[in-house]
Amino acid sequence: MNNKNHLKIATRQSPLALWQANYVKDRLTALYPDLQVELVTMVTKGDVILDTPLAKIGGKGLFVKELEHALLNHEADIAVHSMKDVPMEFPQGLGLSVICKREDPRDAFVSNKYRSLAELPQGAIVGTSSLRRQCQLKSLRPDLDIRSLRGNVGTRLSKLDNGDYDAIILASAGLIRLGMAERIASFIETDISLPAAGQGAVGIECRVDDELVQSLLAPLAHQETTICVLAERAMNNRLQGGCQVPIGGFAQVKNGEVFLRALVGATDGSQIIRAEGKSAVENAEVLGVQIAEDLLQQGADKILKSVYQD
């Protein structure tokens, strides 16, 4: 940072990524009126390869690596991410500074013809880029024709509007943030479609030795969201899952305890393994590991191994 009054935010160029970066910018400038905040936009591997399902591209950090290079090269001071895209392991010298307050974590059912999953006719075509959503949909409705759907939110909605799909499944948070909540035909409750770890939360990454930036970011942290996302990510990490695997994890804080539900599913929906538990909030990450161990004891590793081999 130059003279402690200029901060650069690395961000992807999609409308949702820019919304998230501007959200952080607005929070910071409200706190520090003399701070100049600049967005540095860039394209990631996940943005470029749009003709291949995410799970087939391979690797972790498809939407963050280029942003991390900018941090390491001092071309930016912070990077703003959707938490569900952030790998557990960070490059040396970088780390997660804060997790902001979570938006609605549920999946959204979006259709121009039908109001809910239950209304979909036999063999309806449903678009999703997520193996997690696919396995839960297939378990609930084996008759559905699940097809890959890539691109930013606007692109996906256009494909629906063009008649390529009867319905598509998106994260509610993205639609709400982009002012498109009216496109949500219905919210899919978490007992029907368990969200991805970190879904709906925004995280900020920075250089670990940049104490000034860390102190500037500290007021943006949301304690309850942080507890929940840390539990979810600890579970995901123990399962060695990235963001392109059929793993769901969702935590909630109630009465001073954190409750975590998680699942691992075969992509065809033929098998879904579930686990849940609770602990004191200070043990959120320990709980995440325990829930993952429960899933592994039930055979989650065999399911995940078959997914990686596909």
Curated annotation (Swiss-Prot):
Does Coiled coil appear among the keywords?
Answer: no
Tell me a Gene Ontology molecular-function term this record carries.
hydroxymethylbilane synthase activity
Q: Which reaction does it catalyse?
A: 4 porphobilinogen + H2O = hydroxymethylbilane + 4 NH4(+)
**EC number(s) reported in the record:** 2.5.1.61
User: What cofactor does this one take?
Assistant: dipyrromethane
Q: Cellular component terms, GO, for this chain's entry?
A: cytoplasm
Cofactor binding: number and manner: Binds 1 dipyrromethane group covalently.
Where are residues bearing S-(dipyrrolylmethanemethyl)cysteine located in the sequence? 243
Q: What class of enzyme is it?
A: transferase
What pathway does the annotation place this protein in? Answer: Porphyrin-containing compound metabolism; protoporphyrin-IX biosynthesis; coproporphyrinogen-III from 5-aminolevulinate: step 2/4
**What are the alphabetically sorted keywords of the record?**
Porphyrin biosynthesis, Transferase
- One biological-process term from Gene Ontology? protoporphyrinogen IX biosynthetic process
- One Pfam family it belongs to: Porphobil_deamC
Misc. comment: The porphobilinogen subunits are added to the dipyrromethane group.
Q: What does this chain do? A: Tetrapolymerization of the monopyrrole PBG into the hydroxymethylbilane pre-uroporphyrinogen in several discrete steps.
Q: Which family does it belong to?
A: Belongs to the HMBS family.
Query: Could you tell me what this protein is called?
Result: Porphobilinogen deaminase
- Organism encoding this protein: Mannheimia succiniciproducens (strain KCTC 0769BP / MBEL55E)
State the encoding gene.
hemC
